[in-house]
A protein has these predicted regions:
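Polybasic, positively charged surfaces/segments
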Residues: 2-350
Length: 350
């Protein structure tokens, strides 16, 4: 079975989301609901399939298919870079890193020593080397689940490091990527120059998703018995985000309640954690999984986590400005909790 990729802007249509309250979304229904924002696919988008280049989904987890139609032991990755992941045994996943001093290895070492942060991430089992490569050894978050539903939600209003946008050089390649997605986005001056800065492009990119407005964006999901859908980054409006999450939860009251409690727990631990007080957390995801018997949610992917200078204080909620290092991860958790609360209330009233 192959992973499904959708390389174009899309949105949910409200009309096609009008299922009965007991309906649960499946892969075919998702495909039917995905449409272009302007109801036709532009040739420039066809030729620029990676124009948005939203950073890769974070899930360092492989999905072991347990469907009868799929050979036993077949592995599929929900999202991310498949070449960086190696399935292990006994509930362990290996994630390839650059070396023992890789930024993510440093982050996990710090998190493992924090009484609060360590409760909301995959268990860190150490760093190992094999055949010249270096790997993180992490808890396989899907171990023990059977044919689960999975969602990857990238957190934060800013999903790029400040160091990535310091260069003010005007770039024609980023201008071309911008107009491939949104031809009217550049200003008259930018059209004249046929170039934009990387900061301008990155901010545009965040606005194309729900990252800027909600502090999170849905990267990918997989429903029970279906292949992953790995390009939902432009699901943006309040209604579309709400409906996507609601359909993912299949109106399962107990699942929604347990996940809501876990999200609140994650928020509380972040607020108490010394690690989070001293680090910006950029590009991390909340990884949600449930099956018929269990639920789980963890914060994953710390490749872009950076320790702050001693004089820098952040609250993870304030609006980002260059130099303040705010990334908005707690703002996003607040928004996500609010949506889960609304879904829970709706489920209880029906």
């Amino acid at each position: 079975m192959t992973t499904t990729f959708i390389n174009r802007p899309m949105a949910w249509t409200n009309q096609r989301l009008k299922y009965t309250q007991n309906d649960c979304i499946n892969l075919k229904a998702l495909w039917k609901m995905l449409i272009l924002n302007d109801n036709h696919e532009k040739e420039d988008i066809k030729s620029n399939k990676n124009a948005l280049e939203l950073s890769a989904p974070a899930s360092p987890v492989l999905l072991l298919q347990q469907q009868k139609s799929i050979p036993s032991g077949t592995w599929l990755q929900l999202a991310g870079h498949p070449e960086s992941i190696a399935p292990g045994a006994n509930g362990i996943v290996r994630k390839r890193i650059s070396g023992v001093d890789d930024s993510e290895a440093i982050a996990y070492r710090g998190i493992s020593k924090d009484a609060y942060a360590s409760k909301i991430v995959p268990k860190f089992l150490g760093v190992t080397e094999s055949n010249g490569d270096t790997y993180l050894e992490l808890q396989d978050l899907l171990h023990g689940f059977r044919d689960p539903a999975v969602m990857d939600i990238k957190m934060g209003r800013r999903t790029f490091l400040e160091s990535e946008v310091k260069n003010t050089k005007l770039r024609n390649d980023l201008y071309k990527k911008m107009i491939a997605v949104a031809p009217t986005e550049p200003t008259d001056e930018e059209h004249k120059q046929e170039a934009v800065t990387k900061l301008r492009y990155m901010l545009f990119r965040e606005r194309m998703s729900s990252s800027e407005s909600k502090g999170f964006r849905i990267e990918a999901l997989r429903m029970k018995g279906s292949s992953p859908i790995t390009d939902l980054k432009t699901v943006k409006s309040d209604t579309d985000v709400y409906n996507t999450i609601a359909r993912f939860l299949c109106r399962k009251q107990n699942v929604t309640k347990q996940l809501l409690e876990r999200l609140k727990q994650i928020r509380g631990y972040i607020e108490k954690s010394h690690f989070f007080q001293r680090h910006e957390i950029v590009g991390s995801s909340i990884f949600i999984v449930y099956d018929e018997d269990r639920v789980g949610a963890w914060l994953i992917d710390f490749a872009k986590s950076r320790r702050l200078d001693e004089h820098v204080k952040i609250d993870h909620r304030s609006q980002w400005e260059i130099g303040n290092f705010e990334e908005g991860i707690l703002y996003g958790v607040d928004q996500l909790i609010s949506i889960f609360e609304d879904i829970s209330a709706e489920s209880n009233s029906t």
